[in-house]
Amino acid sequence: MPKRVLQGVVISSKADKTVTVKVERKFKHPIYKKFVKVSKKYAAHDSENKYQEGDKVSIIESRPISKTKTWVVVNGE
């Protein structure tokens, strides 16, 4: 099964080797036909501590690194 890749924005980089990434998605509501924006936060592994708040990054699914981290930052802008 291919690994999922998501794009988002770093909203916290306070923890060591960990960043919190906010991923937003839009979809059309099936009944009301209005576009709805939904966001979710992911804890991602940043081994070099090189990403700061506000950076746009891509994260990829990986094996569990800790209790809450199952994503790794692969690149940023």
Curated annotation (Swiss-Prot):
Disulfide bonds: none annotated. GO terms for biological process: translation. HAMAP family: Ribosomal_uS17_B (MF_01345_B). Belongs to the universal ribosomal protein uS17 family. The lineage of its organism: Bacteria, Pseudomonadati, Pseudomonadota, Alphaproteobacteria, Rickettsiales. GO terms for cellular component: cytosolic small ribosomal subunit. It holds the Pfam family Ribosomal_S17. One of the primary rRNA binding proteins, it binds specifically to the 5'-end of 16S ribosomal RNA. The keyword Disulfide bond does not apply. GO terms for molecular function: rRNA binding; structural constituent of ribosome. SUPFAM superfamilies: Nucleic acid-binding proteins (SSF50249). This is Small ribosomal subunit protein uS17. The gene is rpsQ. InterPro entries: NA-bd_OB-fold (IPR012340), Ribosomal_uS17 (IPR000266), Ribosomal_uS17_bact/chlr (IPR019984), Ribosomal_uS17_CS (IPR019979). Keywords: Ribonucleoprotein, Ribosomal protein, RNA-binding, rRNA-binding. NCBIfam families: PRK05610.1, uS17_bact. The keyword Ribosomal protein applies. Part of the 30S ribosomal subunit.
